[in-house]
Amino acid sequence: MTLSFTTRWRDELPATWTALNPTPLHNARLIWHNAELAHELAIPQSLFADNKGAGVWGGEALLPGMSPLAQVYSGHQFGVWAGQLGDGRGILLGEQLLADGTTMDWHLKGAGLTPYSRMGDGRAVLRSTIRESLASEAMHYLGIPGTRSLAIVTSDTPVYRETTETGAMLMRLAQSHMRFGHFEHFYYRRDIEKVQLLADFAIRHYWPHLQEEQDKYAIWFRDVVARTASLIAGWQTVGFAHGVMNTDNMSIMGLTLDYGPFGFLDDYNPQFICNHSDHQGRYSFDNQPAVALWNLQRLAQTLSPFIAVNALNDALDSYKQVLLAVYGKRMRQKLGFYTEQNNDNDLLNELFALMAREGSDYTRTFRMLSQTEQNSASSPLRDEFIDRAAFDSWFSRYRARIQTEQVTDDERQLQMKSVNPAVVLRNWLAQRAINDAQKGDMEELHRLHDVLRNPFNDRDDDYSRRPPEWGKRLEVSCSS
């Protein structure tokens, strides 16, 4: 089957991009590809047959119909206007036309210098490329919307960061790479025509059912708010911290975008900061919902020339309601509650307080809670707590709550295990795969990808256990 690509962004959004080809790496080699995703998108396996990576994965060739470009956008970084940014190391190769009429961006990250590289070299390192690849697939299989990873290429090209590292490329796929920052770029240049052109493009291609609506812009923005709220609720339920929630890293589609110094909670700490450059804790785990709303307010400002202020405010006011509704539903599922009762939030908050006091492992706590039997006062989770009396007090009230549901233990346990993963991408697991890959051994990279495809399966091994002490102390920066 021949792949078909369109050039909609290039054709319909002039002055938002610069045309250029990728700069190949030296001696590029394909080290991993996503066979399942390739099958879903009808991408021929023959494209991955050349183990030396001499092809589209390493920026050495283009497929018919591709017309590569780098996009320009701006943004607020750590709450401060940063001005022009743009694709500093990534190139949009093309938009694949899918059988259902939708498209999928092919975005090559680490593709070399662009006009938007600023002081950078346009490259990505193997370390960050592996992290993003693992994270995007882990989040997908946890049910959280985001970009996908199709292939990783390594090379003999040295890249200079804090130390000399290995140059790499990642083929990243997404329904769209349109960011809040695209709108900000033209708004702050007083080019409102381009802002509206971006909105028209989004509605025409991603919200086509709104095209004939009289208030299409207001309805569209309200859905962007809802998608963002739902995304953040998903992050909070799986214990994911993004680390760099700048407006240029926010997707209008409600996708997790740009995996940098992210982290999943190990010990439950609501003030968890995964980015060691975030000295003020702006992007701490507990602050993510508020930051997302702040970012939406910045987007709303760019749309104010053609959406009424009251409509923008109404949409922004709906954020909290959607966030709490989605978060509440997911947390009730994690607790095994089929109905909503008045004291559910109190029960959850009391558990969180106990976990924070004890430093309980976030993922393991909810997974082990999935084994609860409503008529048994014993629980394997009890051994995870030092203050047994406090746990017993909470657990007795929890058992009383699940006894109000007309559900068998087997049914509830099965349901809870379907939403409480046994495995998440802990930093130490990613680092172990990276360490091996940097030595030329890709076995753990492939194995970890396979494990992350089935996060809800029962297992009792390194992937589901608490991290070792050294694994808890890993610091991650924005360097990539």
UniProtKB/Swiss-Prot annotation:
The gene is ydiU. Its cofactor is Mg(2+); Mn(2+). This is Protein nucleotidyltransferase YdiU. Keywords: ATP-binding, Magnesium, Manganese, Metal-binding, Nucleotide-binding, Nucleotidyltransferase, Transferase. GO terms for molecular function: AMPylase activity; ATP binding; magnesium ion binding. Its EC number is 2.7.7.-, 2.7.7.108. It is an enzyme of class 2 (transferase). ATP binds at residues 86, 88-89, 109, 121-122, 172, 179, 258. It catalyses: L-seryl-[protein] + ATP = 3-O-(5'-adenylyl)-L-seryl-[protein] + diphosphate; L-threonyl-[protein] + ATP = 3-O-(5'-adenylyl)-L-threonyl-[protein] + diphosphate; L-tyrosyl-[protein] + ATP = O-(5'-adenylyl)-L-tyrosyl-[protein] + diphosphate; L-histidyl-[protein] + UTP = N(tele)-(5'-uridylyl)-L-histidyl-[protein] + diphosphate. The keyword Secreted does not apply. Nucleotidyltransferase involved in the post-translational modification of proteins. It can catalyze the addition of adenosine monophosphate (AMP) or uridine monophosphate (UMP) to a protein, resulting in modifications known as AMPylation and UMPylation. The active site is at 248 (proton acceptor). It comes from the Bacteria. Pfam families: SelO (PF02696). PANTHER family: PROTEIN ADENYLYLTRANSFERASE SELO, MITOCHONDRIAL (PTHR32057:SF14). Belongs to the SELO family. InterPro entries: adnlytase_SelO, SelO. Mg(2+) binds at residues 249, 258. NCBIfam families: adnlytase_SelO, PRK00029.1.
